[in-house]
């Protein structure tokens, strides 16, 4: 099965974080949303989710894209909604 390979960029630091795999963009976004809902994340609007490539777990082949693809950059109101759900 092919999995997407993702990373979150910190726009203030101008660097990508650790990579992780997810079965699709929706699952990767859910994981990203969980991170942003954490009230300990001080500047959630500094982060964007990118897809870097694909990993085929049956062949072990990792294929990177020529350029990272932006998957999700939440708006301020979306971040607020995530954080409100976390507090409840």
Give names to the regions the model predicted:
Residues 37-88:
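Short, mixed-charge low-complexity intrinsically disordered segments
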Residues 15-24:
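A short, exposed loop/beta-hairpin motif centered on an aromatic-Gly-Thr core
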Residues 11, 25, 52-55:
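Generic structural motif
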Residues 10, 30, 82-84:
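Short, intrinsically disordered low-complexity segments
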Residues 23-44:
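A short, charged, amphipathic alpha-helix used as a generic interaction element across diverse proteins
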Residues 15-16, 29, 58-59:
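Eukaryotic short linear interaction motifs
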Residues 1-16:
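Short aromatic-glycine-(Arg/Gly/Cys) micro-motifs in beta-strand/loop hairpins
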């Amino acid at each position: 099965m092919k999995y997407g390979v993702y990373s979150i960029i910190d726009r203030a630091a101008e660097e990508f974080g650790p990579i992780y795999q997810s079965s699709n963009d929706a699952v990767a976004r859910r994981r990203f949303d969980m991170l942003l809902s954490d009230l300990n994340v001080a500047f959630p609007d500094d982060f964007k989710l990118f897809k870097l490539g694909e990993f085929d777990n049956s062949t072990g082949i990792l294929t990177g894209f020529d350029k990272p693809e932006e998957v999700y950059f939440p708006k301020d109101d979306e971040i607020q909604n995530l954080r409100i759900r976390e507090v409840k």
